[in-house]
Amino acid sequence: MSDEEIRNEYTILERSKKDTQAFGELYEKYFERIFTFIYRQTDDEDLTADLCSQTFLNALSHVNKFEFRGVPVSAWFYRIAANEVNKYYRKKKSTRVFSIEEIRVKELVEISSNEYNEELIQRLIGYLKKLPTDMLEVLELRFFEDKDFKEIAYILNITESGAKMRTYRALDKLRKNFNLSIKYDGKK
């Protein structure tokens, strides 16, 4: 997202402090992305709908507290959504669910055509689901949500170097356990 697009979103958010109708533009733009982000962590449409509604309700009710930090407004929504999901699982004391799409795993891993097989992808998905939550969160945001490290740091309330380190460690585990080449540039 360009700096100009980020500033435009920030302007809309500023307008929504006085006119809640303006918030609708951001809601329309990001609802589906936030819904999908939450759904991957719940695998339950009704629960996802509730948590997504709560995410946007919290954002709207706290719009006056929003501070611009150079990241897209979407990062703020993702942060609220991540907090809502964490709060839900803490309250329920249940195991977190991660629904990982096979197609996204195929995009993540560079597999030459002669090495590719369905069994490998299924084993990889199973392994990803067993990763510690902090590692899976960064992989999801980085590769499935296409967030840069600055946004990941903001969403997870960690430093940018912490986001890079978690990503590197998670990918290193995958490389070692599956002897795979993983798409990772470490820059963005």
Regions found by a protein language model. Name each.
Residues 87, 95-121:
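Internal acidic/polar
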Residues 19, 118, 128-136:
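Short helix-coil-helix linker/hinge
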Residues 65-68, 79-99:
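Arg/Lys-rich amphipathic alpha helix in sigma70-family domain 2
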Residues 27-46, 62, 128, 177-180:
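Amphipathic, Lys/Arg- and hydrophobic-enriched alpha-helical face
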